[in-house]
């Protein structure tokens, strides 16, 4: 069994959950004109972030694997401009494109994670906020936990839209 098989399964289950929500996402209103800095994300913004964060965290894992001395600096904060601007840009993409990116990035992440051995999973990085973490911890927290949290966020956003639709007269 691959070292990160349980985490990979969590990623696949989360993807399947996101796919089951696709019809509701397609029927949801487009992202508002204002950028999502002072409000909750709508469905398409959440998907845009998931699409952005998968390759980001894979890149950070690769940075740690390639680093000559441990712990290798890695990570970012939620207010980093590149993160925010990517979500701002991609939140208006058509839903089929958001899902195509999800499939592409998630499969790439899964393939790479299944290649890692115990020694690689034990490599350490150092995050400014979280401190030292192994690659296994990064995969667990920054990929698996993270995508599961956003699945819940997406489902809640869609439930909110459905509740608003039901409460409208007519």
Describe each region flagged by the PLM.
Residues 48, 59-66, 111, 140, ...:
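Generic alpha-helical structural context detector
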Residues 1-14, 30-53, 85-101, 126-146:
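Alpha-helical scaffold segments that form or flank carboxylate-/histidine-based iron centers
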Residues 16, 51-55, 107, 114, ...:
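Solvent-exposed alpha-helix faces
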Residues 96-121:
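Short, positively charged, low-complexity/disordered linker segments
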Residues 144-161:
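A hydrophobic membrane-anchoring alpha-helix module
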Residues 17-44, 66-72, 112-134, 164:
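Helix-loop segments that flank and shape redox-cofactor active sites
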Residues 11, 15-22, 57, 61, ...:
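Hydrophobic alpha-helical core bundles mediating ligand binding, dimerization, or RNAP-core interactions
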Residues 1-9, 55-102, 159-170:
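Short, helix-capping/interhelical loops that line the mouth of catalytic, cofactor-
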């Amino acid at each position: 069994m691959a070292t990160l098989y349980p985490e990979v399964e969590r990623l696949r289950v989360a993807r399947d959950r996101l796919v089951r929500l696709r019809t509701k996402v397609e029927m949801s209103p487009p992202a508002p004109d204002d950028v999502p800095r002072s409000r909750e994300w709508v469905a398409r913004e959440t998907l845009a972030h998931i699409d952005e964060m998968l390759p980001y965290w894979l890149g950070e894992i690769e940075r740690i694997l390639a680093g000559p001395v441990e712990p290798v600096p890695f990570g970012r904060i939620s207010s980093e401009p590149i993160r925010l601007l990517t979500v701002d840009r991609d939140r208006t993409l058509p839903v089929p494109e958001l899902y195509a990116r999800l499939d592409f990035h998630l499969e790439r992440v899964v393939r790479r994670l299944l290649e890692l051995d115990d020694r690689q999973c034990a490599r350490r990085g150092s995050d400014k906020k979280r401190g030292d973490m192994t690659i296994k911890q990064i995969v667990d927290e920054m990929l698996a936990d993270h995508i599961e949290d956003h699945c819940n966020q997406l489902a809640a956003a869609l439930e909110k839209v459905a509740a608003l639709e039901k409460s409208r007269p007519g």
